[in-house]
């Protein structure tokens, strides 16, 4: 698997020539100076970028990491990006029954352990059963991550948004 990243990058370059669209293992939005980020996959990233833009206008230093390439997991890239961030809210769209976190958050936590970064990690599961993930939901994730980044004690167990009790 160590030989696949250059192959994936070459295919992405070829795809750009044909389509005009560029893809990489991770897409970053306002991560350079962020204290807190949301890490997600898929269509949630667009909503997360919109919310991050609004929060930035309020003076909050937030960003978004969108994972494009899940396997092989971009451990080194994520570790490098998260090493500058105090707290990351990881959004999973599926429950991983019996596991301490959702699938994406488990891989982020594994990255944290393997690379010894100090970033705190929160896991939020939302969008279950095809439910919409609203900007207000993502804003809750950012706000919790910002409290965590400020050193405020927060519950770090998996939390669920938008589910019926």
Feature-to-residue mapping (PLM):
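Conformationally flexible catalytic loops at phosphate/diphosphate-handling active centers
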Residues: 1-27
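Short helix-loop-beta junction
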Residues: 10, 18, 50-64, 113-114
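Peripheral docking tails and interdomain loops at the edges
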Residues: 92-165
């Amino acid at each position: 698997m160590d030989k696949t990243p250059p192959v994936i990058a070459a295919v992405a370059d070829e795809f750009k020539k044909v389509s005009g669209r560029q893809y990489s293992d991770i897409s970053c939005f306002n991560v350079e100076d962020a204290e807190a980020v949301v890490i997600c996959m898929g269509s949630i990233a667009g909503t997360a970028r919109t919310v991050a833009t609004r929060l930035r206008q309020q003076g909050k230093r937030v960003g978004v990491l969108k994972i494009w390439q899940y396997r092989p997991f971009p451990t080194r890239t994520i570790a490098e990006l998260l090493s500058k961030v105090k707290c990351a809210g990881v959004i999973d769209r599926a429950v991983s029954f019996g596991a301490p976190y959702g699938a994406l958050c488990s891989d982020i936590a594994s990255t944290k352990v393997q690379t010894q970064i100090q970033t705190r990690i929160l896991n939020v599961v939302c969008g279950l059963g095809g439910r919409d993930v609203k900007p207000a939901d993502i804003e809750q994730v950012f706000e919790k991550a910002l409290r965590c980044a400020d050193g405020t004690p927060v519950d770090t167990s998996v939390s669920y948004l938008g589910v019926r009790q």
